């Protein structure tokens, strides 16, 4: 049974990758890949995938104030437009690395806004809220 989905987000410079460093960019595409593949294509409920990507990792990492939207928890939120399809362009990723295996692939689930402890950390130019 799968209890969580996470990414170690291992960005490396092109030089590091040329020397065999393991890892890839994953943070910016993680939700869209999981939502498209698991929810849209395999039929898993969004609520289940959301829990696997929030409460699940918080439990595994023993982070008692993370993973839920509830009193006493940190206000860490991600707002997503699940109907927004986009094509990954590795050159436009915010990471220091551009080694993304999803470059050129299309996914649903565009992240529009992120909050960490209630403070805005990312806002898509396409977010109208």
Give residue spans per PLM region.
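C-terminal cap of metal-dependent C-N hydrolases
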Residues: 22, 71-126
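His/Asp/Glu-enriched, well-ordered alpha-helical/loop segment
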Residues: 3-5, 9-82
